[in-house]
Amino acid sequence: MPTSWKDSGLRWYWIVVLVFIADQLSKQWVLSSFELYESVKLLPMFNFTYVRNYGAAFSFLSDAGGWQRWLFTFVAVGFSILLSVWLRQQSTKMWRLNLAYTLVIGGALGNLIDRLQHGFVVDFLDFYWKTSHFPAFNIADSAICIGAGLIILDSFVSGKDVKKSDDIKE
């Protein structure tokens, strides 16, 4: 375990701040510039559309009656603490996991603030094909998904790195 926070994954925490600020600024812009369900076409297959998400990813549990707000708050706080502890315990050189954890934390905190402030998450990135729309999402959701993907990738790549080092020792 690193002896100082400067030698640990916490050195990557600036990414949490960057994701959080980008997410919150984009959502404030949407709230001040769009009416609910207002949509602006930017590119073929891509709109800015202001929607409210009372659930989790892909509107999971959005019609559950309100209790899910506190469940998702607890989950966001819990995962942010857990990943921060893991960041403190790993080397700053573990760039893929450090990046992944900080992306997830930044995204979780961005959506957490929405839930606490508004009771819902502001979503606005709307991709579609013909008449089929992918569920709208935001910068925080993107950061969480990219972070989760990097964690999965690291589990495969790290395993290969360990195998290579074992082969070299033999």
UniProtKB/Swiss-Prot annotation:
Gene Ontology CC terms, in alphabetical order: plasma membrane
Known EC number: 3.4.23.36
Coiled-coil features, chain-numbered ranges: none
Pathway: Protein modification; lipoprotein biosynthesis (signal peptide cleavage)
Spans through the membrane: 12-32, 67-87, 94-113, 133-153
Catalytic activity: Release of signal peptides from bacterial membrane prolipoproteins. Hydrolyzes -Xaa-Yaa-Zaa-|-(S,diacylglyceryl)Cys-, in which Xaa is hydrophobic (preferably Leu), and Yaa (Ala or Ser) and Zaa (Gly or Ala) have small, neutral side chains
Principal location class: membrane
Any one Gene Ontology molecular-function term assigned to this protein's record: aspartic-type endopeptidase activity
GO biological process: proteolysis
Enzymatic class: hydrolase
Protein keywords: Aspartyl protease, Cell inner membrane, Cell membrane, Hydrolase, Membrane, Protease, Transmembrane, Transmembrane helix
Entry's localization field: Cell inner membrane
InterPro entries per UniProt: Peptidase_A8
Function as written in the Swiss-Prot or TrEMBL entry: This protein specifically catalyzes the removal of signal peptides from prolipoproteins.
Family statement: Belongs to the peptidase A8 family.
HAMAP family in UniProt: LspA
NCBIfam families: lspA
Descriptive protein name: Lipoprotein signal peptidase
Name of the gene encoding the protein in the UniProt record: lspA
